[in-house]
Each structure stands twice: as C-alpha cells, then as structure tokens.
C-alpha cells in the first residue's frame, strides 16, 4: 500500500517525533510511505524521516510558511502534483495549522481514504463545528492521542483495537508510543539519599509552565539542601529562568543542558529522579512516558492528556495547573517518603509498556488494512 503522510512542519517537537513513529510503523508493515511537509523543516529532521524508510517531499523551497489565499493556492498546487505523481491509496493528515485546509484540498483533488490525527485536546479550539464537519463528511477516521482528547472533541471515546467496529465515518483513540531512542528499563531505578535530582526535559516555553519551575525549586531548596535541578531544553523562557535562578540564589544548584539530540535523552532521563511537567496545555505528554520508561517519578499538572497518562497516586503525582504551592507540596511528599517514591517508580515501569512501539504499530497497521 502507498501512503501519503502530510504535516505542516518537520522541526523538533513531539508531533514530529510521533509522526516519525507512524512512518516507522508503516514501513515495517511493508508499506511505501511518502511524507509531505508544507512549510518549515530542518535538514536533520528530514534526514530522520528518510532514514526511517520514507520519501520526503518539502513543498516550501525556503522552509517558510505561506499564509492567506497564497498559502491555499500553494498547497493546492503542491498536493495536486504529489497525487498525480505518487497516486497514494491513503492520505494521513496531521491536524495542525493550517488545520482543515489540506483535508478539503485532498478531497477536492479526489482523495477518498483520508485519516486525520490531532495531537492536542479541544481546549485550544474556540469552535469545534469545523472539526465535527470534517469528521462527519470528509474523512474515514479521525484519531486522537488520548481518550480525554477524543471525548473533548466528540463527546465520546473509544480506544482502537482490531475488534473495533468500523463505520463509514469513525473517531478513535490510538495512544502515542515511546520513540526508538527510549527503552523501558529492565532493572529498577535506584534512588540516592545523598543527592536527589529534579528535572525538566522540555521546550522552555510558558505554555510548558517553565516559568514555574525555578520558583518551585527555590522553595524546596530552602528545606532540602540535597536536591539539584537538571534543565534539558531551550526556548524563550531560558533567560527568564536563569534570571530567576540567580535572583532566588539557586543557580549553583541548577545544571543547564540546552537542547539535546534525541539520542542523548535516555542517559539524561537516567540522571533524573523526579521529572517535572507543569504544563499549561498538553495534548498527550510524551515526556511523561519517556521519563516513566526510565523509572522517573513524574509530577505533572492536571491538564489535557496528562491525567490519563500519569495516573495520579499510582505511577506519578498531579498538581493543580499554575499552582506553584501545590507543585511544591507534591514534590515534598516524595522527598519525605522514599518508600513511596520507589513504589511509584516501579509501578511506572510496569505501566508504561502499554505505550510500546509494538502496540502502536500493530494498531495503526491494522487500521490501514481495514479501511483500504
């Protein structure tokens, strides 16, 4: 089967990593995959997709975004040429800005078998009527990355499996998967009494709650001198966070790693005992399952898909969104109870297997075979 995957950008984000997982799953399933990037891309990410066995077509020669009617015409011409040359059996659209436009264009150009995946919950959309129209009249399957997200879009949710009944129009949940560079630990993680490392592995942006991390760490540092903070990532909040650390007198206890290659992340997770995810919006929480796979105890905000991924009190802890005091309280409960921390870590290692690449690949390959 020949499959066209379309995506607005190929940069360094969770959506690109999960779409790369999709490519790997389909190629391993014996399918021919063409990935079309409309706008921005990095040569490194394009190379990752090519190394996974897909053909990559970047429509924008300058890696720039084109808006308005010019953008619509640009997409129409690009997609028309690809459909003429490649003749795919199925198109799989990653639903991000420019949203439904590529879906309408593919339908206009005669593409009937269309799958759409949205990588967020419905809270970022002011109006869902367009998405409901797309799901009911334009695509065969609309997939979401958590059941909470699916319910927020459509009012009901179903986790897809091979026994799921397919209708003419469908919506399901298929969970994201661990990337190939992160493996589930076979041995239990050990926790030291002498030094405890809190960590963030994230884009350093306000939407990820990064402005809350240093204030929370500074409050804890006053009582727990053994703790340190490892910051992996970069973004617009980095300078702000560094200024906070200096102002609050904790900069000597913070290690700034900057943006890291995917291949380096596993060893960095292994240095983290308690992984912080104070996001203001989170469709799934890929960082959470990556951390759990390495035995980290995740402390995350109660927002978006995180409560579904981080089972509160079972494999990690949740705190109220934008609440530094509650975040501090949850971390403190771990620092005060080493036995509980170890148990949550062990539970996480068992629990995270449901997000394995094998399960993800089986689900999507089965879905493709059934709708073609």
Regions found by a protein language model. Name each.
Residues 4, 190-208, 214-217:
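Conserved donor-binding/catalytic core segment of Leloir-type glycosyltransferases
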Residues 5-13, 17-73, 162-167:
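N-terminal strand-loop element at the rim of the active site
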Residues 57, 139-185:
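Donor nucleotide-sugar binding/catalytic pocket of nucleotide-sugar-dependent glycosyltransferases
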Residues 83, 259-260, 267-272:
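Short alpha-helical donor nucleotide-sugar binding micro-motif in glycosyltransferases
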Residues 93-99:
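Short His-centered aromatic/hydrophobic patch
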Residues 280:
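Aromatic "clamp/platform" in nucleotide-sugar-dependent glycosyltransferases that forms part
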Residues 297-300, 310:
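Short hydrophobic beta-strand element within catalytic cores of glycosyltransferases
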Residues 312-313, 317-324, 333-338:
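Conserved acidic donor-binding segment of nucleotide-sugar-dependent glycosyltransferases
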């Amino acid at each position: 089967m020949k499959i066209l995957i379309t995506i607005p950008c190929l940069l360094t984000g969770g959506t690109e990593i999960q779409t790369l997982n999709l490519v790997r799953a389909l190629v391993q399933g014996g399918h021919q995959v063409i990935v079309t990037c409309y706008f921005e891309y990095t040569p490194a990410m394009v190379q990752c997709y090519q190394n996974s066995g897909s053909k990559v077509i970047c429509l924008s020669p300058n890696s720039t975004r084109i808006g308005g009617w010019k953008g619509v015409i640009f997409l129409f011409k690009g997609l028309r040429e690809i459909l003429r040359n490649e003749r795919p059996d199925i198109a799989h659209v990653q639903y991000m800005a420019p949203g439904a436009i590529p879906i309408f264009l593919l339908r206009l150009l005669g593409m009937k078998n269309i799958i759409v995946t949205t990588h967020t919950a419905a809270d970022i959309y002011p109006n869902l009527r367009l998405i409901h129209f797309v799901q009911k009249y334009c695509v065969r399957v609309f997939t979401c990355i958590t059941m909470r997200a699916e319910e927020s879009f459509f009012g009901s949710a179903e986790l897809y499996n091979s026994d799921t009944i397919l209708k003419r129009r469908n919506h399901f949940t298929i969970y994201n998967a661990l990337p190939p560079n992160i493996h589930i630990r076979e041995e239990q993680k050990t926790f030291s009494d002498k030094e405890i490392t809190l960590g963030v592995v994230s884009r350093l942006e306000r939407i990820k709650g990064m402005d809350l991390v240093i204030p929370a760490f500074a409050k804890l540092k006053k009582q727990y001198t053994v703790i340190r903070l490892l910051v992996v990532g970069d973004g617009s909040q980095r300078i702000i966070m560094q200024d906070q650390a200096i102002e609050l007198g904790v900069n000597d206890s913070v290690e700034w790693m900057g943006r890291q290659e995917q291949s380096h992340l596993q060893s960095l997770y292994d240095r983290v005992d308690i992984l912080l995810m104070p996001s203001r919006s989170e469709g799934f929480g890929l960082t959470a399952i990556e951390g759990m796979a390495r035995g980290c105890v995740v402390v995350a905000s109660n927002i978006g898909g995180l409560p579904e991924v981080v089972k509160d009190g079972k494999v990690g802890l949740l705190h109220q969104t934008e609440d530094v005091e509650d975040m501090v309280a949850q971390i403190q409960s771990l620092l005060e109870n080493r036995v509980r921390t170890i148990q949550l870590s062990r539970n996480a290692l068992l629990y995270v297997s449901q997000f394995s690449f094998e399960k993800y690949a089986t689900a999507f390959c089965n879905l493709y075979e059934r709708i073609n």
